[in-house]
């Protein structure tokens, strides 16, 4: 009779311990708020909002062989180049691996300036700009992201560097 009573007490203790352990595991898992998994954008500055984690690992390969590590702080913004990235939050436990894709955006803005044009790269990737007069190629210039070049011509083509 005593053995059955002790067995019941042991069973209750095991069940309570398992419930507490499962709750603790859920409590220490990193909580990823943003960005969403499989997020795609052409913006290069990404806002990471993560709770219950100490660090963020970002890599361009799924094995995380050469990750960049960032200390997590409220409103962490990271500037990334176009490409596909894998990332995870690390605390007591690790979050699941998520993906993030930054698409290349080619975008030239022209401003007429007297006899010339100012060509501004408002995309997110460096460009080679071919300048034409009619059908003749007259100049090639390199324009970095946010940079501007003064050119003379009547046709302009942005090409990936």
Language-model features and meaning:
Residues 92-104:
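Extracellular fibronectin type III
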Residues 65-72, 139-143:
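Short beta-strand segments within Ig-like beta-sandwich modules, predominantly Fibronectin type-III
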Residues 55-61, 130-134:
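Predominantly extracellular/luminal cell-surface or secreted proteins
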Residues 21, 101-119:
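Low-complexity, Pro/Ser/Thr- and charge-rich linker/hinge segments at domain boundaries
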Residues 8-27:
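Hydrophobic membrane-insertion alpha-helices, especially the h-region
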Residues 30, 34-50, 111-124:
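Short coil/turn motif common to extracellular beta-sandwich-like domains
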Residues 77-86, 148-156:
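Surface-exposed, short loops/turns at beta-strand junctions within beta-sandwich domains
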């Amino acid at each position: 009779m005593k053995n059955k009573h002790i067995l019941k007490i042991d069973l209750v203790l095991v069940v309570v311990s398992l419930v507490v352990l499962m709750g603790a595991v859920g409590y220490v898992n990193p909580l990823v708020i943003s960005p969403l998994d499989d997020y795609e954008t052409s913006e290069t500055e990404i806002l990471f909002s993560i709770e219950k984690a100490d660090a963020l690992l970002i890599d361009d390969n799924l094995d995380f062989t050469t990750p960049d590590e960032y200390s997590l702080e409220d409103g962490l913004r990271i500037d990334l180049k176009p490409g596909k990235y894998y990332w995870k939050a690390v605390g007591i436990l690790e979050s699941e691996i998520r993906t993030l894709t930054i698409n290349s955006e080619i975008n030239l803005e022209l401003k007429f300036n007297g006899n010339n044009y100012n060509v501004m790269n408002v995309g997110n990737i460096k460009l080679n700009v071919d300048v034409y007069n009619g059908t003749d190629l007259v100049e090639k210039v390199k324009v970095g992201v946010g940079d501007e070049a003064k050119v003379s011509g009547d046709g302009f083509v942005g090409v990936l560097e």
